[in-house]
Swiss-Prot record:
Keyword Disulfide bond: yes
Name the record gives this protein: Mast cell protease-like protein
Residue intervals of the Peptidase S1 domain: 21-244
Cystine connections: 50-66, 143-208, 174-187
PROSITE patterns referenced in this protein's UniProt entry, alphabetically: TRYPSIN_DOM, TRYPSIN_HIS, TRYPSIN_SER
Record-listed E.C. numbers: 3.4.21.-
Length: 246
C-alpha cells in the first residue's frame, strides 16, 4: 500500500505538488544535461510530471508508469517555470514498452520515448551513458539521483532541478515492499539518513560513476528510504534493438 500511495503521488497534477528530491541540494544549472522534464497530458486537463533522461538524440528513457497518450519532453531545463534559452521542448512521437512490463508488481518499470525530432546536443542538452548488460550496480555503491519533485511530504514542488547522493543497499532492506526482485531492481537509500527520491522524481536516473544504472520507480508513502529503482542493465539488449529500429 505504501508503494501504491507513493506511485499515485508521483503522478500528481502539475502545480499541485508533484514530488521532489528529499535531503538534497539544488543542482548547478545545466550540470546534468541529460535530464528531461516529462509532461504526460491525460483526461480532463490532468498533467502528470515525471523525470527522464536522454540516451540518444531521439530517445528519452523514463519509468513505464509515466507513459500516456500525449507526452512532451523538455530538455536543457534548470528552472521549469522559466523560458530558459537552453530549453528544447519536443513532443513524443510514441512510447515503447518492454515486452515483460508488469503493471501490478512494477517489475521492468521502464519505457523508451521516441521524440518527434532529434534533440540538438549542446552544453545544456546531452546524452548519458548506459551500463553494459552484465554491469550490476552493487550494495555500498554511492550514486546520484536528480529531479524536480517535492522536498518533503508537506513541501511544495520544486521548480529548479535538485540532486541527492544515495547509497545502494542490500535487497533485505527492500523486503518491506510487497514486490522486489534484486535482478530487476535496485534498493536505494539508507534508513539512517534523511535522503531519498519522492513524488515527481519518478522516471529520473540513478547515476553511479557517471553511468545511468537505475530509474526511479516506487517507494514509501511517508518518503522514508529506501526506494526502488528499475535496474537498467538487464534491458540493454532490448534498448539497443529499439534504438536500431529492430
Amino acid at each position: 500500500m505504501q508503494a501504491l500511495l507513493f506511485l499515485m503521488a508521483l503522478l500528481l497534477p502539475s502545480g499541485a505538488g508533484a514530488e521532489e528530491i528529499i535531503g538534497g541540494v539544488e543542482s548547478e544549472p545545466h550540470s546534468r544535461p541529460y535530464m528531461a522534464y516529462v509532461n504526460t497530458f491525460r483526461r480532463k486537463g490532468y498533467v502528470a510530471i515525471c523525470g527522464g533522461f536522454l540516451i540518444t538524440p531521439q530517445f528519452v528513457m523514463t519509468a513505464a508508469h509515466c507513459r500516456g497518450r500525449r507526452m512532451t519532453v523538455t530538455l536543457g531545463a534548470h528552472n521549469v517555470r522559466k523560458r530558459e534559452c537552453t530549453q528544447q521542448k519536443i513532443k513524443v512521437e510514441k512510447y515503447i514498452l518492454p515486452p515483460n512490463y508488469n503493471v501490478s508488481s512494477k517489475f521492468n518499470d521502464i519505457v523508451l520515448l521516441k521524440l518527434k525530432k532529434q534533440a540538438n546536443l549542446t552544453s545544456a542538452v546531452d546524452v548519458v551513458p548506459l551500463p553494459g548488460p552484465s554491469d550490476f550496480a552493487k550494495p555500498g555503491t554511492m550514486c546520484w539521483a536528480a529531479g524536480w519533485g517535492r522536498t518533503g511530504v508537506k513541501k511544495i514542488i520544486s521548480h529548479t532541478l535538485r540532486e541527492v547522493e544515495l547509497k545502494i543497499v542490500g535487497e533485505k532492506a527492500c523486503k518491506i515492499f510487497r514486490h522486489y526482485k534484486d535482478s530487476l531492481q535496485i534498493c536505494v537509500g539508507s534508513s539512517t539518513k534523511v535522503a531519498s527520491v519522492y513524488m515527481g522524481d519518478s522516471g529520473g536516473p540513478l547515476l553511479c560513476a557517471g553511468v545511468a544504472h537505475g530509474i526511479v520507480s516506487s517507494g514509501r508513502g511517508n518518503a522514508k528510504p529506501p526506494a526502488i529503482f528499475t535496474r537498467i542493465s538487464p534491458h540493454v539488449p532490448w534498448i539497443n534493438r529499439v534504438i536500431k529500429g529492430k
